[in-house]
Amino acid sequence: MCIRDREKIPWEIPSELLLSIQGIISINMIHIASWNCTKSLFNESSKLLKNGQFLMLYGPFKIGSKHISQSNELFDISLKMQNESWGVRDLGEVSEEANKYDFIEEELIRMPANNFSVIYRKGSL
């Protein structure tokens, strides 16, 4: 299922799907959305997921406030030129926000094209 309006809360999810949610995957979202969308993602996910379920993010991240490649740095600049609220997020800041909603970073997986998959687990704090 695709949530198109990322800032709209609560998310409108058909009732027949609510009981079958086992995890949430967000691909290439938080760098092309405002920081409020990231907050909304964690907030709404925390309401929908049970303890032990996962939220996975995929996309580019800075590590320790540093870009992992020159191409990611150039991509970040191009995003900010399109919209000043967009940009490659620092993983530490994202995980800090996740912690506020009872998610803990469980696994970080390096992916092709200087991207990462980050798996958060609910209720692991």
Model-derived features with residue positions:
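Conserved small/polar residues in nucleotide/adenosyl-binding loops
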Residues: 1-5
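Short conserved loop adjoining the S-adenosyl-L-methionine
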Residues: 9-19
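Conserved acidic residues
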Residues: 22
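A conserved beta-strand element that flanks and buttresses the S-adenosyl-L-methionine
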Residues: 25
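A short, conserved alpha-helix within the catalytic core of class I
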Residues: 32-48
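Conserved beta-strand signature within the Rossmann-like core of class I S-adenosyl-L-methionine
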Residues: 51-65
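Conserved Class I S-adenosyl-L-methionine
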Residues: 68-92
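Core SAM-dependent methyltransferase catalytic element
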Residues: 101-125
